[in-house]
Amino acid sequence: MTPTPLDLYNRKVEQGSLQADPHQKEALATLDTLFQRLFSGQPRDGFLKKLISRISGEDIRGIYLYGDVGRGKTMVMDLFVEAIPADTALRRVHFHAFMRDVHDYLHAHPKKGIIGLVKTISKQTDILAFDEFHVGDVADAMILQRLFSALIDKGLIVITTSNYPPQRLYEGGLQRQRFLPFIDLIEQTMEVIELSGPVDYRARELGCKNTYFSPLNGENK
């Protein structure tokens, strides 16, 4: 039986490589539900067709995991990625790198545009996993609305982490009103999970290391 993301988490806790955290475990329970729906022991041939047929008529097409820095969002997502069977067409990428690839494609193939990009991605990918989803300018905002709408229509599963809840994406941005339908799309088609908790694991890890500041002035003392 294929171990689920929560199985992997519990194993790492037992081995002492992770500290048990109820907030992380709660988020992983939701990821487990999606994982088991996708990989419930069905034959692995023709995965994408099976995936589309299994999610037809269902609203949830992915997970949007957000929360403060250092709460373990990336670790939780990576456990989901680690559990996915090796023959699945998976792409795990930092969101900034993904958007750089998007702009490169659109620049190189102006006639194909978003439609061509969607065809290319959907042929190569069943599941997209993004780390640190963020929208910084109006060009990206407009591209994302069209791109993600089309990818979700194609049946792709999207897993992403972000420091911001959907309603705060592109907050205060130019022409943000035109971006609001994309926020609606996220909330309608993805399970939105807040990973909260009082522990900042990133700060704790840095605190265990020797850290040096330069220049040595009053501000850094």
Where are these regions (language model features)?
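Short glycine-rich substrate-engagement loop in P-loop NTPases that contacts/grips substrate
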Residues: 92-125
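Conserved lysine of the Walker
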Residues: 73
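Hydrophobic positions on the alpha1 helix immediately C-terminal to the Walker A/P-loop
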Residues: 76, 80, 94
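N-terminal pre-Walker A segment at the start of P-loop NTPase domains
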Residues: 18-51
